[in-house]
């Protein structure tokens, strides 16, 4: 099955149903599909052909889904750019992937012009009226383009998407996904996370050209709808749940924390809401317990990564209802994924021991773009992908993530995983956010070091927090130093950027 075939099947079956809601406007399946056809012809008229890379610098909007589908139908490779990244990062992404056409939204015209000026040969096209008259208005061009499906040939191994990792290690990597793997992502979501029907509606506030967009096709092929917000505002988000009859949410822990920050989430009208899917970063135990108390067992957690989206493991609603230790688990393996834990040499570890998670599944990447050596280190010839995540299985078969192998701290010969220390710190009532890294130490080589932000109006001393951790973990895991800071740095997808805290501590040491 190809991803483009899923688009065509959904359009044919549900032509008259509403597919997308944006504010007070909506589009039917037929309208989304026709716009995709027209945009595909516009792209072809710009000289973009099968296999060419097209950069996307877009916020969420009425035509976001049509743009994605247009790229599929035109046979081009989407290279989405996160608007929160720097111009230098955007430039590197575009250059490394050989992008010659950048499609941007009017609100990001300034960045688009900056990129155009820094890159010879980069053409710019605006999804709407641009403040720059010499840039093509794709919406105007779309109105006069053919509405017929271009019906270009497509093959399972055709690369259709290049997704850059969030760069928590400081290295941007371009994971490639194909027609077949993207269709498999849709099947993975339907098999493990949601099972929508024609009356189901998912709310999107994160960027559709990134991970959130993977939930569009599962609802599309079942006749459901997407409510698309321009960004995440807690009040607007909760209002949309009742306004549009939303049945499912897709969010990251940071978003859930913002929803519950002022108590409004407890008072919100949830209407038809039945499922809250979350993932992308660890969920603080106090937060999920509070959310469960308020909203009940509507929650489903997934663990995955850019190289193997979306769901390697799942912690389902029944698991959340059981609660207890299970709330700290990543879940049980997805029905369409094979997982194994290995040592540094690649051999399986004994039951209960910590090992690196490796996965084999139809939805894994086809390798990193133009990086054969990096691909060889991460993707074996037998199809197994190294995740670089350390984990263990419990006696019930649930996977428990320990940490990233690159984040592990070795202090006095003992291994310390930052996440377990962060979990202990986060259980203190005064702690809002925290991050743990290793700092250079003449005696221990690395010293466990914590960065903490306190809740508004709360107080806690360094000694109190160290005592709190000591009551829960071994002595060598207790932070030697606690730094109180205003903010903790996060990546665009909500992962702690430990390197931003760690690297300054090691200047001159390595």
List where the protein language model places each region.
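Conserved AMP-binding/adenylate-forming core of the ANL superfamily
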Residues: 8, 16-61, 65-69, 86-91, ...
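Conserved AMP-binding/adenylation subdomain of ANL enzymes
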Residues: 183-201, 209-248, 262
